[in-house]
From Swiss-Prot:
Pfam families: PcrB (PF01884)
Required cofactor(s): Mg(2+)
Residues that bind sn-glycerol 1-phosphate: 12, 159-164, 189, 209-210
Domain of life: Bacteria
GO process terms (BP): glycerophospholipid biosynthetic process
Upper classification of the organism: Bacteria, Bacillati, Bacillota, Bacilli, Bacillales
The UniProt record lists the keyword Heme: no
InterPro entries for this protein: GGGP/HepGP_synthase_I, GGGP/HepGP_synthase_sf, GGGP_HepGP_synthase
Family: Belongs to the GGGP/HepGP synthase family. Group I subfamily.
Keywords from the named record: Lipid biosynthesis, Lipid metabolism, Magnesium, Metal-binding, Phospholipid biosynthesis, Phospholipid metabolism, Transferase
The protein's name in its UniProt record: Heptaprenylglyceryl phosphate synthase
Top EC class for this record: transferase
Subunit structure: Homodimer.
Length: 229
């Protein structure tokens, strides 16, 4: 079993986007700590299974971030369950999770499942629009969500999601200072090694996603930048 607490860098792959076998091999053999499979729209059991089978040719740990109950399948090392703490819709905070537990609760391996407390901060992002996230937050608001995840809900992961735009480094630093047990994940807008290294100063885990599809070479350079190898 892998220890997610030591992961510094992960790639996130969208099953609804095209990725060549060559580029997938580069990602999986890059030295990243894990590959997360997940997306906001167009996620189906078929494209999730296709991605799973492709990644399983390699030794890298593989995580399914669950956004649709219908796309859950066995075979991943871990399952991340996002709860969008700043969503205006209860279904994205606990509703979908309740449905999943009704359907799969009896067969879940709880050692493989981790809840993520998301705070979505880019109003233009698909995930913000889908979940109706309240993104016009002050730093105090964000820190309060971090405390909620860390101290009240005791979630293992607090995820600052800027999805498509580069975030506020000072805010990431201040959020990290508040967390006692939750690991801080940062995702959003990382387009080069310098940005990845900057966020890695404060985030426990840096998530690199969109740049994979735009500039694979820059994406690969983020691994060493984050892990200092």
């Amino acid at each position: 079993m892998y220890d997610i607490s030591g992961w510094k860098h992960v790639f996130k792959l969208d099953p609804n986007k095209e990725l060549s076998d060559e580029h997938l091999e580069m990602i999986c053999e890059s030295g990243t700590d894990a590959v997360i499979v997940g997306g906001s729209d167009g996620v189906t059991i078929d494209n999730v299974l296709h991605m799973l089978v492709s990644i399983r040719r390699y030794a890298v740990p593989c995580v399914l971030e669950v956004s649709d109950v219908e796309a859950i399948t066995p075979g991943f090392d871990f399952y991340y369950i996002p709860s969008v703490l700043n969503s205006r819709k209860v279904e994205w905070v606990t509703g979908v999770h309740h449905e999943a537990l009704k359907e799969f609760g009896d067969i879940m391996d709880w050692d493989e499942i981790f809840m993520e407390g998301y705070c979505v901060l880019n109003p233009e992002a698909k995930v913000a629009q889908l979940t109706e996230a309240k993104c016009d937050l002050t730093e105090d608001d964000v820190i309060a969500y971090a405390r909620l995840a860390d101290k009240l809900l005791h979630l293992p992961i607090f995820y600052l999601e800027y999805s498509g735009t580069y975030g506020d480094v000072e805010l990431v630093k201040n959020v990290k200072a508040e967390l006692k047990q939750a690991k801080l994940y940062y995702g959003g807008g990382i387009s080069n090694a310098e940005q990845a290294k900057e966020m890695a100063q404060y985030a426990d885990t840096v998530v690199v996603g969109n740049i994979i599809y735009d500039d694979i070479k820059s994406a690969l350079k983020t691994v060493k930048a984050v892990k200092g190898e």
